[in-house]
Amino acid sequence: QFLDMIFDVCKNIAMPLHIYDRNSHRMSHFFEFRFPKNAGLHMHNQLPYTETGTVYKRYAVSLNVNSITNSETMCSRRLLEILACGGILVTNNSPVVERQFRNFCHVVQDASQAQEVLARLAAGPGPEDKERAAAGAVYVRSHHTWQHRLEQLADTVNF
């Protein structure tokens, strides 16, 4: 539902959406998620993981959708990657976003919020948006690297 709402808002404000489909290489899309054909989406094939940072930096705004929205700890890897790259991020809310990332991204919950934020960002991010993104990059690099997770895992299992 959130993704459909974002597609509608972007279409209404004529904000182009570029989607890099991680499932584009699959032979059968019968059971796979299909993007709507009438949403004005610019579809791209999947990328090698090593190119994702370059792609995130190419766009003024990146969208994230957390499919798990009730977890205290789970968020998409994409959220961390976009923030780590210094990207301006628009995302849906979840407990972990609220607790750890709210200050570094634009959290939208409904169509009116999404329209307001995305229309403003489409016109060009302002200094506050850029400062928020830069702070997000510092925060992720300081608290959410693989090294941090491995240390946390080692501590948890008394390794």
Residue ranges and their predicted role:
Residues 123-157:
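A charged, aromatic-enriched C-terminal amphipathic alpha-helix characteristic of glycosyltransferases
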